Amino acid sequence: MTEYQTIKFEQAGAITRITLNRPDAANGMDDTMTRELADAARRCDTEATKVVVITGSGRFFCAGGDLKSFASAPSRSRYIKGIADDLHRAISTFARMDAVLITSVNGVAAGAGFSFAVTGDLVLAAESASFTMAYTRAGLSPDGSAS
C-alpha cells in the first residue's frame, strides 16, 4: 500500500475512504496533497472499486489552496500551475470514474475545496458545513474545475 503524507487512503473490499489530513492547515491543498489526490484518484479508477468516500480531518473539509505554501514557493507561478494541474487531474478522474463518489463535508469547503466537495455524486453536508468560492478575497481567479 502506498503511504501518503497529506491524505489517508483506506480500502476495504470495494469501498475506499480518502481523508484529507492536514488539519493544522485547514486541509489546505499544497503540491504534495494535490499530487497525492491525483494518485489516489488513479488508484480508485478500477472496476473493483464501487464506492469512494472523501472527507476531511479536523474542523475543515478543505480550505482550498494553501496560501502560505503559495507565498513561500520559489517560483510561485510554476508552483500554482503544478497544483492546479494535479487537482484538475484528480477531479476529472473522480468525476468520470464508474465508482460512486460520496463527499462527506464537515466544516468549511472553500475555493478549490468547494469545487472538490461538489465533485461528489452525493454530497453529504454536516450541520457544520459551509460552502464558499472565496477566490476574490484571496485575489485569485477560480480554479479547481470551477470555471
Indicate where each model-derived feature is located.
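Conserved CoA-thioester-binding segment of acyl-CoA-metabolizing enzymes
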Residues: 1-57, 92
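Hydrophobic/aromatic residues within transmembrane alpha-helices
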Residues: 18, 54, 66, 116-118
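Conserved phosphate-binding and hydrolysis motifs of nucleotide-dependent enzymes
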Residues: 27, 56-58, 64, 105-107, ...
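Glycine- (often His-adjacent) and acidic-residue-rich active-site loop
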Residues: 35, 56-93, 137-139
